[in-house]
Swiss-Prot record:
Gene expressing this chain: dapF
Its job: Catalyzes the stereoinversion of LL-2,6-diaminopimelate (L,L-DAP) to meso-diaminopimelate (meso-DAP), a precursor of L-lysine and an essential component of the bacterial peptidoglycan.
Sites annotated Could be important to modulate the pK values of the two catalytic cysteine residues: H165, E214
Metabolic or biological pathway: Amino-acid biosynthesis; L-lysine biosynthesis via DAP pathway; DL-2,6-diaminopimelate from LL-2,6-diaminopimelate: step 1/1
Keywords: Amino-acid biosynthesis, Cytoplasm, Isomerase, Lysine biosynthesis
Protein name: Diaminopimelate epimerase
GO process annotations (BP): lysine biosynthetic process via diaminopimelate
A GO CC annotation given for this chain: cytosol
EC category: isomerase
Length: 288
């Protein structure tokens, strides 16, 4: 029998981003890509956040992040807020530190049911994002969808928040068929690790509206790292201030690109939905 059978989990969401939190700190179990896909077939999610025993002193857990297609990600802002909510529920600490593939993330609770995650500094160099070819200025790269003389989407900004993001600037985020263009752009050869694709509409210097096609997931109500990447990209273009609020289909996030250390801070809520246990039959079916 699969060791995950009958394990308890928490179903949560971060402004509509569907999250499953699986705490394996006390009973470590290896989670495979096939396991992640099997779990998604039972409990539909955007990201699976797996808490494993800490690898670094002073941290609460090493968090592995899976997309619902079984691929792994290094960052998920909404998922980390859900993880923070769950761990804060049994912790007397005012701040928590977690480790992911992208490094250490500090989390704190500025108000009831509001959680801030320090997502660290953005990566802006073309090799670090990464891109398949050199671009000296990642504020705007040569990439478009549609006819050469009348492209539908063009010249995105690119940023990594531990995962690659391409942000296309538009007048209306709802005027484009992101479900159609998203998978084409996600898998474009310029992105060797694929990319999250965001449409961004700047309302004023303090407000941006976005929609995101999430790598390994598809259309999503919210993507926290996309909100962070968009805020950074817009500030680099001098179109917004370093503190902005981002409107996503699922709700609102506050983003600050802190000038003192270049770190990006994301603040928003996390909602608990229910607890459950995995059905052993799900893993048996996946293994057959």
């Amino acid at each position: 029998m699969n060791e995950l059978a009958n394990r308890s989990f928490s179903k949560m969401n971060g402004i509509g981003n569907e999250i499953v939190v699986l705490d394996l700190r006390d009973h470590p179990v290896a989670v495979s890509a096939a396991d992640a896909r099997a779990i998604a077939s039972e409990v539909p999610y955007d990201q699976l956040m797996v808490l494993q025993p800490p690898r670094t002193p002073g941290t609460e857990a090493f968090v592995r992040i899976y997309n619902n297609d079984g691929s792994e990600s290094s960052a998920c802002g909404n998922g980390m807020r859900c993880v923070a909510r769950q761990v804060f529920a049994t912790s007397a600490s005012d701040a928590l530190t977690f480790e992911t593939r992208a490094g250490l993330l500090n989390c704190w609770r500025p108000a009831p049911n509001l959680y801030t995650v320090d997502m660290g500094p953005p990566k802006l160099g073309w090799k670090d994002i990464p891109l398949a070819e050199e671009f000296r200025d990642t504020r705007s790269i040569e990439l478009q969808i549609g006819p050469i003389d009348a492209p539908v989407l063009h010249t995105p900004s690119v940023v990594s928040m531990g995962n690659p993001h391409a942000i296309f600037w538009v007048d209306d985020v709802n005027a484009h068929d992101l479900a159609r263009f998203g998978p084409l752009l996600e898998n474009h050869p310029i992105f060797p690790e694929r990319a999250n694709i965001t449409l961004a509409q700047i309302v004023d210097r303090d407000h941006i509206v976005i929609r995101t096609w999430e790598r390994g997931v598809g259309l999503t109500k919210a993507c926290g790292s996309a909100a962070c990447a968009t805020a950074v990209a817009a500030a680099r273009l001098r179109r917004v201030n370093r503190v902005v609020h981002i409107t996503l289909p699922g709700g609102e996030l506050g983003i600050e690109w802190r000038a003192s250390d270049d770190h990006v801070l994301m603040t928003g809520p996390a909602a608990f939905e229910f607890e459950g246990r995995f059905d052993p039959a799900v893993f048996a079916a996946a293994a057959s």
